[in-house]
Amino acid sequence: MRSDVSEIEKETKCPECGSDDLRGDYERAEIVCGKCGLVIDDNLVDMGPEWRAFDHEQRDKRTRVGAPITYTIHDKGLSTMIDWRNKDIYGRDIPARNRAQWYRLRKWQRKIRISGATERNLAFALSELDRDSSRLGLPRSVREAASMVYRRAVENKLIRGRSIEGVVAASLYAACRKCNVPRTLDEIAEVSRVSKKEVGRTYRFLTRELNIKLPPTSPVDYVPRFASELGLSGEVQSKAIEIIEMAMENGLTSGRGPTGVAAAALYIASVLLGEHKTQRDVAEVAGVTEVTIRNRYKELTEQLDLGVTL
């Protein structure tokens, strides 16, 4: 008896017509030839759960497995915790004479979960990483990637002599670039309580020692976030991206900060499409000076002949 539809489709052809167009029907537990209709196997096993759920609440109640493994927790989410509420499995209150015992059990359980210097380091660092990620509004994928970078740094003994906060910030910056969720060094430094210089220095050290290859950040990556914060339309975003792509083709972005180019392109696009924003507004969102925007603006309008004047 076969239970893997893909295995049958790869290894078997229809004995009647020779066609390899085999289709699985889980409702009837059959493998059927899509050309002649011959039933090739009628003992297909459904490997899914035996229960059905029609919403998230039912799915959470009926599933019998725990949360998936995550690198954002020092023990990867594999351990359990004693609930802080003094209730048993049936929801009844624990007798007062047993509460002191439960308090001691919780205390020992917390100590057991974090045993050793490495575990303590990971527990503190990953909580710091979660705090910084929340303040930056980063998605789950970036948090997982940053946690993996930090774990690699710990495994390779790269933490010694450096602050945990600095390594966490550098790991976050590397993860943002890897996942194409750009954040500037200034933004990372602002939430991490370490200087921009230290974040940059630690980032370069980690990428060199861990052999992390990251592509250069493109100005296009910053456009959606800046446009959203400025309240600009999708048409302005598209026009700004078009301007940036033209600038890249003409070599106008080489040696220029991506945030400055993105800010200038958005400013030009907003003027062209009648959704004008002041240079000060754009500069504040992009984290650059008004002088930078004017310089990039002048370069883009003159070299690309966009027909816009200050």
Swiss-Prot record:
- Per-repeat ranges for sequence: 127-210, 221-302
Keyword Transcription found:
yes
Task: Cite the binding residues for Zn(2+).
Answer: C14, C17, C33, C36
Q: Name one GO molecular function term.
A: TBP-class protein binding
> Keyword set for this entry?
Metal-binding, Repeat, Transcription, Transcription regulation, Zinc, Zinc-finger
Query: What Gene Ontology cellular component terms go with this record?
Result: transcription preinitiation complex
Alphabetical list of SMART domains matching this protein = CYCLIN
The UniProt entry, under HAMAP family, shows: TF2B_arch
- Explain the purpose of this protein: Stabilizes TBP binding to an archaeal box-A promoter. Also responsible for recruiting RNA polymerase II to the pre-initiation complex (DNA-TBP-TFIIB).
The protein's name in its UniProt record: Transcription initiation factor IIB
* Source species: Methanothermobacter thermautotrophicus (strain ATCC 29096 / DSM 1053 / JCM 10044 / NBRC 100330 / Delta H)
Upper taxonomic lineage? Archaea, Methanobacteriati, Methanobacteriota, Methanomada group, Methanobacteria
